[in-house]
Amino acid sequence: MSLTIEKITLACTNISKMPEFYSKVFKADLKEHNFGDFKMYSAKLGNLRFLFCPNEIAGVDANQSRHQFDYIVENVNEVIEAGLASGGSIHSELQENDSELFVTLLDPDGNTINFIEKK
């Protein structure tokens, strides 16, 4: 059996804050979509399609950490600056070992995201 992830949908509490964060941190070109009275946003991050939709549409009752992904980046300090400048915060401080630098940020909804810079 072959399995490929085509799209990830993130249910968001603070949907209005998500575009700025993901545009700056991931350099994603988010597109706005209207679904009745709701706004949703979609983008391609790497080879994966993402859809950000309000909790009300998704019917999700979780308050934070509905997902966690690890991303390999070229410059982790650049990602930290972009995240802090666009509504994110640091969950765990920048750490370093022999092979990588890594940090965990929180997006505006409080979801943890790990960023890793390989040495």
What are these regions (language model features)?
Residues 47-51, 109-112:
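Short, charged/polar, Gly/Pro-enriched secondary-structure boundary elements
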Residues 27-34, 70-71, 92-94:
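Short linear motifs in intrinsically disordered
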Residues 1-13, 42-44, 59-119:
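Vicinal oxygen chelate
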Residues 2, 9-50:
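Core segments of cupin and vicinal oxygen chelate
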Residues 35, 60, 95-98:
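A short beta-turn/loop motif at secondary-structure boundaries
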